[in-house]
């Protein structure tokens, strides 16, 4: 009835429990118009909302929620379990749905009542992250149980760290022997690798690592990982001997990491299995505190990783690492980096790939997607991935429909039809879906002229369905930008187009991109202008 009948009790307050109380009260107030008082203990005549008790039956970030007469309890298995439990309570039992940055729906009600129930849940992966502009909304990040690398990795050293730890600009001239030996000479440089058999380099790295951890007390993990670039690993006689014996350049890398892990047994060391180091060594096994960050950068995305040649090579590597390690971090790529504002229909493979990762001992996942506004259905991709990273056994099609109806309202049936048509056209074309694609690659397939006219008709109907709601209309128009951009890119390769009509289409794209804050077309920062 708009008056508090319960109080929030945190017996031993922590930062996470306090954040959970704030989250609960924020949405209780938005629903009912009032907040629940905080109390160090139960109050006579009031029900108690107990936050932060320990739950032994769930893992880190997991939670137990129990509701019985007079008491609602959200208990934690550690980490952010209390906060995530509160978000689940709000979503499942109080009618709040979060969709994207600052975008949520709820039903106002002066009276909030809960049934008796009990549930417990833990995440499939201990670390879950996406690139999404929505992550700038702290409530969104908590709601979708996302983390950030600087919360885990000391000094934010989490990928391609060789040159950050020992810059070639500092050590290259005085100690070229620290760097890769290729074609008869040492090659120090920003993208060179280390000579991993050099004992002096190892001791220097140990000193640097010790300094980094001392500068970041409380942090337990760091990445010691190759610089970006392929086939730049050291081929001096000693490194080459190890790699030939191990059957992969990962051999010398894992031996080096094992030595570090043994020197610092209370720390965890992550390293890349990427490009030349993707496949595991034949003999040496990573120590338990060596984390393998395995990257699927070379894989095509039109089908699950198990179903095409590029994916099967990655799966072979994944299964090989899984045989020797239970500590695998997957870096998965899920958007077109060369043309971010273009259709990328990979939604049908997300669940199967994440289930594959879980099956093969992955404990951490980073989904590199959606860094900018305007990328293909960025909000839906982030929503589905966050849900599936918590539990990869969910129905991906159901998640898609939930999002479309919640975020786009009456336009949802048309956008669902568009997604199914686009996906079907991709698969029927036999054209691979690549993270460095051009829409021109698909002009005879999923982006052919006939289909593009059909897509335009579908979006016209979607816009008309929400024409009286400026917020929903804006969301639909932003979702349409990838089709508009693709039409313009394809037109550049063709003769006979109506120049005046194309000029109008260019101006419409520019205007809508500016209206919705879409500024970047690819990861090289090429702008709309």
PLM features per residue range, with description:
Residues 37-59, 67:
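Short, well-ordered secondary-structure micro-motifs within conserved domains or adaptor modules
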């Amino acid at each position: 009835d708009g008056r508090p009948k319960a109080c929030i009790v945190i017996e031993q307050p922590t930062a996470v429990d306090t954040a959970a109380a704030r989250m609960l009260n924020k949405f209780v107030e938005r629903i009912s118009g009032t907040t629940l008082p905080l109390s160090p203990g139960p109050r006579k005549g009031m029900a108690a909302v107990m936050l932060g008790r320990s739950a032994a039956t769930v893992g880190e970030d997991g939670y137990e929620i129990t509701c019985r007469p007079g008491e609602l309890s959200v208990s934690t298995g550690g980490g952010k379990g209390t906060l995530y439990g509160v978000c689940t309570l709000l979503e499942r039992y109080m009618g709040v749905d979060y969709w994207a940055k600052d975008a949520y729906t709820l039903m106002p009600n002066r009276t909030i009542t809960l049934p008796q129930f009990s549930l417990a849940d833990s995440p499939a992966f201990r670390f879950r992250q996406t690139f999404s502009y929505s992550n700038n909304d702290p409530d969104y990040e908590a709601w979708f149980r996302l983390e950030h690398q600087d919360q885990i990795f000391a000094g934010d050293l989490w990928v391609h760290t060789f040159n950050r730890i020992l810059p070639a600009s500092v050590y290259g001239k005085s100690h070229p022997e620290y760097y890769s030996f290729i074609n008869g000479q040492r090659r120090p440089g920003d993208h060179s690798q280390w000579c991993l058999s050099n004992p002096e380099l190892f001791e220097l790295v140990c000193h640097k690592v010790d300094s980094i951890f001392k500068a970041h007390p409380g942090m337990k993990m760091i990445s010691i990982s190759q610089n970006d670039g392929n086939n730049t690993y050291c081929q001096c006689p000693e490194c080459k001997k190890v790699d030939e014996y191990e059957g992969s350049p990962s051999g010398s890398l894992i031996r080096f990491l094992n030595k570090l892990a043994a020197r610092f047994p209370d720390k965890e060391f992550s390293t890349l299995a990427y490009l030349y180091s993707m496949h595991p060594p034949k003999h040496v096994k990573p120590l338990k505190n060596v984390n393998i960050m395995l990257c699927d950068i070379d894989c095509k995305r039109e089908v699950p990783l198990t179903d095409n040649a590029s994916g099967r090579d990655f799966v072979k590597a994944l299964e090989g690492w899984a045989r020797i390690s239970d500590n695998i971090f997957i870096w998965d790529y899920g958007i077109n980096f060369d043309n971010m504002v273009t259709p990328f229909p990979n939604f049908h493979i997300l669940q199967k790939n994440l289930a594959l990762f879980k099956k093969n001992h992955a404990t951490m996942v980073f989904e590199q997607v959606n860094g900018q506004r305007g990328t293909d259905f960025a909000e839906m991709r982030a929503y589905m991935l966050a849900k599936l990273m918590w539990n990869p056994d969910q129905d991906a099609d159901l998640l898609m429909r939930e999002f479309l109806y919640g975020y786009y309202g009456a336009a949802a049936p048309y956008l669902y039809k568009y997604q199914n048509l686009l996906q079907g056209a991709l698969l029927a074309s036999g054209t691979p879906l690549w993270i460095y694609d051009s829409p021109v690659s698909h002009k005879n397939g999923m982006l052919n002229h006939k289909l593009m006219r059909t897509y335009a008709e579908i979006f016209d109907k979607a816009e008309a369905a929400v024409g009286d709601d400026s917020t929903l209309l804006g969301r639909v128009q932003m979702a349409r930008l990838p089709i508009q951009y693709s039409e313009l890119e394809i037109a550049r390769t063709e003769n006979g187009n109506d120049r005046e009509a194309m000029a109008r289409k260019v101006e419409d794209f520019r205007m809508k991109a500016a209206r919705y804050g879409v500024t970047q077309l690819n990861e090289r920062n090429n702008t709309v202008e």
